[in-house]
Amino acid sequence: MISSPLILHFPSSMQMTDDQFFQFCQENRDLRIERNQFGEISIMSPAGSETGNREGNIFGQLWVWSEKDGTGITFSPSTGFTLSTGAERSPDAAWIKLERWNQLTPKQQKKFAPICPDFVIKLRSDSDNL
């Protein structure tokens, strides 16, 4: 397992398009992959059992609340979002208001949706620095 993220740097001539990055992530589903606004790619190993359990509990609680509330939808840690900076990030749990989600096209909803969730949870791992 990778204890801290592996950062890949690419020259501007080798930057991936959004579609290429999405395909790269699909081909490497066993890894947690994010991209920052500068095109640098962070590769993290899958979560350990303890972290996976905490993620599952947090996501479950958010999902139960969302189902009762009925005004939005939840997303698991395997979901990527394209932020306004161009970065693609995957929080440990996310929630988006239905009215905002429904403004996206089906094509946008299918890939890394170009939207910043209304609520996110990101667990701090042992390798994260503050």
Question: For each predicted feature, which ranges?
Answer:
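Gly/Pro/Ser/Thr-rich low-complexity, intrinsically disordered segments predominantly at protein N-termini
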Residues: 1-130
